[in-house]
């Protein structure tokens, strides 16, 4: 049995295909979703979406939004999303370093909040690339 996963941003459909399982970062922690999961709607945090497709794990960086799960259908609506295969590791690392520097330089509450969000996004992109090696040990 499979799930139909659809990941949408305001500008495009990032994923629309059947999957075996996902692990989703929510505002309350990570949740695993298998076929026949209970119906829920949840906020999606800036974090990594892990997708099991047959015997292979794939990852995607999600930049916050909402998810609806029910009847073996998962719809994820996010501000932005990138598959790990689409992320340039050097560019992601440079963006992370810039975000860290900007957070150190931030003055005032608003600048610090914006810099912290940029850092979380940059860190998630780097972690998404590195997450595949971690998934090798995930039991099926």
UniProtKB/Swiss-Prot annotation:
Pfam families associated with the record: ATP-synt_DE, ATP-synt_DE_N
CC terms in the record's Gene Ontology section: chloroplast thylakoid membrane; proton-transporting ATP synthase complex
Subcellular location: Plastid, Chloroplast thylakoid membrane
Molecular function terms from GO: ATP binding; proton-transporting ATP synthase activity, rotational mechanism
Membrane topology: Peripheral membrane protein
Matching SUPFAM superfamilies: Epsilon subunit of F1F0-ATP synthase N-terminal domain
Tree of life domain: Eukaryota
CDD domains documented for this protein: F1-ATPase_delta (cd12152)
Keywords annotated in UniProt: ATP synthesis, CF(1), Chloroplast, Hydrogen ion transport, Ion transport, Membrane, Plastid, Thylakoid, Transport
Biological function: Produces ATP from ADP in the presence of a proton gradient across the membrane.
Family assignment from sequence similarity: Belongs to the ATPase epsilon chain family.
Subunit annotation: F-type ATPases have 2 components, CF(1) - the catalytic core - and CF(0) - the membrane proton channel. CF(1) has five subunits: alpha(3), beta(3), gamma(1), delta(1), epsilon(1). CF(0) has three main subunits: a, b and c.
Protein name per UniProt: ATP synthase epsilon chain, chloroplastic
Organism: Panax ginseng (Korean ginseng)
């Amino acid at each position: 049995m499979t799930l139909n996963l659809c990941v949408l941003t305001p500008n495009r459909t990032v994923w629309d295909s059947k999957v075996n399982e996902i692990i989703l970062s929510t505002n309350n922690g990570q949740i695993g979703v298998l076929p026949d999961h209970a119906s829920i709607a949840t906020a999606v945090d800036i974090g990594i979406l892990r997708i099991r497709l047959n015997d292979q794990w794939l990852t995607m960086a999600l930049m916050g939004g909402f998810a609806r799960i029910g009847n073996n259908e998962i719809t994820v609506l996010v501000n932005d999303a990138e598959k790990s295969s689409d992320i340039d590791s050097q560019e992601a690392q440079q963006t992370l370093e810039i975000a860290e520097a900007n957070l150190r330089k931030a003055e005032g509450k608003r600048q610090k909040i914006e810099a912290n969000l940029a850092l979380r996004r940059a860190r998630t992109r780097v972690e998404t690339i590195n997450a595949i090696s971690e998934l090798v040990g995930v039991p099926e």
